[in-house]
Curated annotation (Swiss-Prot):
Pfam family, one: PMR5N
Annotated protein name in UniProt: Protein trichome birefringence-like 32
Organism from which the protein derives: Arabidopsis thaliana (Mouse-ear cress)
Residue ranges annotated as Lumenal topological domain: 40-451
Motif GDS motif: positions: 180-182
Keyword Electron transport attached: no
UniProt subcellular location: Golgi apparatus membrane
Segments carrying motif DCXHWCLPGXXDXWN motif: 427-441
Amino acid sequence: MTTALFSPSNRRKRRLTHFFFTVLAFILLAAFIYGHDFISFSRRSLHSPTIVHQSAIVVVVDEPPPPPPTSPPPPSPPPPSPPPPSPPPPSPPPPAFAVGKTPEGCDVFKGNWVKDWSTRPLYRESECPYIQPQLTCRTHGRPDSDYQSWRWRPDSCSLPSFNATVMLESLRGKKMMFVGDSLNRGMYVSLICLLHSQIPENSKSMDTFGSLTVFSLKDYNATIEFYWAPFLLESNSDNATVHRVSDRIVRKGSINKHGRHWRGADIVVFNTYLWWRTGFKMKILEGSFKDEKKRIVEMESEDAYRMALKTMVKWVKKNMDPLKTRVFFATMSPTHYKGEDWGGEQGKNCYNQTTPIQDMNHWPSDCSKTLMKVIGEELDQRAEFPVTVLNITQLSGYRKDAHTSIYKKQWSPLTKEQLANPASYSDCIHWCLPGLQDTWNELFFAKLFYP
């Protein structure tokens, strides 16, 4: 018996039994210690998502993992500051020769005539040897001199005083030209009379070469010139002394024949008007005066005048520098042949008139408002090369007293009938010097130096 109990087989069984009870005891002890957690885990497992174990990787099948915590977005940068305002465009350079500026709203061409013996006349007729005998009224017997005493006073500002020294200094090394008809020649002579007393006798001279008259200022290396071109364009009236042609013909677009004499001028003053007022259509030559068979067409005065101004502006743009030169255009000079225009007797004219017209609304009947409109349209101040308009028309229209009338050199002997009726040969186109045209030059001075 003893042998059987301690046989190797029994000894193995006892060891297995001992091991079994040891494991069982361990399980029971663990169950006691972790029983609560085990129960909680078991309950949780019934509701937990299925987890697949693969090596050391855990994959959640039915729910994505919560996103990783993110940092709060950085604060938005402040809105950019608005760009600084663009600087204003640079002001255009002042016109050539300008030394100042006319006040805003000042129209020197609107005003009235006031008598002023303290400052008028600006020179004496006898002191200026350059006045043509057609304009020396006192020398030719005019009994009154009141026409010399009137000063133009603008309504809203004052007119700068004419300063011969300023004008002469501005002309150093320069060339000034007046281009047009006999009315522009009168303005040219007036300017020379306003300047000549400031120039030494041996340093000035005047010479005429056909259509061109040149006043030389040797100490200033300067010239003031006049060029006869009553239409500005080439015409059959271009002879400076023999131009009384009844059948006037103007060559279309032909400015270069005259224009070659104007090149190099620093200041140009144009005028043209009276010669276009024929009462008929204008004859316009298409081609050359040298053509054996001439093609001539007729145009209304308005259309022909517009053509001339367009051609003038085209020449200016091509030949003048807007930064270094200045161009002016004097509007129409009125005549006074109809006394009824100012409330006078019918059949009377400027003869024996000694005072200006007082009606400030007066407009000279011979001055075409249609042609004035053409001037305004073609000489636009906003153009690439602005032409300064000297609007002398209305202010001159008041001056029925300032014409040469009968007090001038007569080129032909007067008949008995004319002598018996002085009004019949009275010149109501041209103006006595000194007189109205000195005012034109005061206005020219203002616009040249104070634009």
